[in-house]
Regions:
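Conserved alpha-helical substructure of the radical SAM core
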Residues: 225-253
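Conserved, mostly hydrophobic/aromatic
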Residues: 69, 177, 212, 216, ...
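Generic structural signal for well-ordered alpha-helices
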Residues: 20-28, 84, 174, 241, ...
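N-terminal pre-triad scaffold of radical SAM enzymes
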Residues: 193-220, 253
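N-terminal [4Fe-4S]-dependent radical SAM core
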Residues: 129, 133-205
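Conserved SAM/AdoMet-binding glycine-rich loop
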Residues: 34, 243-307
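Glycine-rich beta-alpha loop elements in corrinoid/cobalamin-binding modules
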Residues: 1-155
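Flexible glycine/acidic-rich beta-alpha junction loops that bind and position SAM and/or redox cofactors
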Residues: 1, 45-47, 77-85, 106-109, ...
């Protein structure tokens, strides 16, 4: 690429490859004893051993290469508050091993806890089938109602532990999160550098849901947000849309309403709300489940209200 849409002015070369790892190592060099907690899409999708396209190699958990102390995967609203409360109470970051939606490293697993043991990292390097087996086990444990605690060995004295994911947010919680007073733009200091081009795609868009029960093999959304759909209320979305119209750069139209799975406005079936997603089959493959609720009326009603 000749430009970088996420950099001021679209200039290439300002952001390093493996940004989380680079920045964390620089922080660790300057602030040796400060807790480093990572999250976001890069950390989430590299939380355990993973294939890296840039280097064409299997890489270790980003938690090890970045030298971070704790990793929060998924959307993280609940887990980040729990971690902040624990640190505020004086707890050492290395003792924060009990929060759902987190990944941490240890020299030896706790014998009082149960784990689902993944193939060790060395076996992944030696046998591609072991890597497929490992990812399948990870994929089978993305549901907060049934997921087990995962243990990934790196030799005999280093282990990465993934706690089960956080429970989905309720609609009230979703409304609260998206109702916070966000600035909806980049930092003003970037303006003189040409602004950040990527903001144009999202500044006047509305997120209405998260999660996906589609399970497409080319997509990582389920691995990041889970299979259970979570939605905002119509009132929350309409309120944000109204505020958007007062933005000085608003052109009179909304770019997008929804997200990758915009037409999913409810869990695939009623069972998912109390028991989670099925472990023995997918919602849509090889044929749609008979219990799946296929109804777009709520989304259509939302779009009509926004119009």
């Amino acid at each position: 690429r000749q430009t970088d849409a996420f950099t001021p002015g679209g200039v290439m070369g300002k952001r390093p490859d493996y940004a989380v790892t680079v920045y964390c190592n620089l922080i660790r060099r300057s602030f040796r004893d400060v807790p480093i907690i990572i999250g976001g899409i890069e950390a989430s999708l590299r939380r355990l051993a993973h294939y890296d396209y840039w280097s064409d190699k299997l890489k270790r958990s980003i938690l090890l290469d970045s030298q971070a102390d704790l990793l929060l995967y998924g959307m993280g609203e609940r887990s980040i508050v729990e971690v902040a409360d624990a640190l505020n109470d004086g707890m050492d970051v290395h003792d924060i091993t009990y929060i759902d939606g987190t990944v941490f490293r240890v020299k030896a697993p706790d014998e009082n806890l149960s784990y689902l043991r993944l193939p060790d990292y060395q076996s992944l390097l030696e046998n591609p089938k072991k890597y497929a087996e490992s990812f399948y086990l990870q994929y089978q444990n993305t549901d907060p109602f049934s997921a087990k605690r995962l243990l990934e060995p790196y030799g005999v004295q280093e282990f990465v532990v993934q706690n089960p994911p956080q429970k989905p947010l309720s609609q009230q919680e979703m409304d609260h999160v998206y109702g916070l007073p966000y600035c909806r733009t980049y930092h003003p200091s970037y303006e003189k550098l040409g602004g950040v081009p990527a903001i144009s795609e999202v500044r006047f868009s509305l997120a209405s849901n998260r999660g996906c029960f589609g399970a497409c093999s080319f997509c990582a959304l389920t691995f990041h947000q889970g299979r259970i759909i979570q939605t905002r209320s119509h009132e929350s979305i309409l309120d944000e849309a109204e505020k958007m119209t007062h933005e000085p750069d608003f052109k009179g139209y909304i770019h997008d309403v929804g997200g990758p799975t915009a037409n999913f406005r409810q869990p695939a079936c009623k069972k998912q709300l109390t028991k989670g997603a099925c472990q023995n089959r997918q919602c849509l493959f090889p044929t749609p489940c008979k219990n799946m609720i296929a109804d777009h009326s709520d989304y259509v009603a939302l779009l009509r209200k926004l119009r």
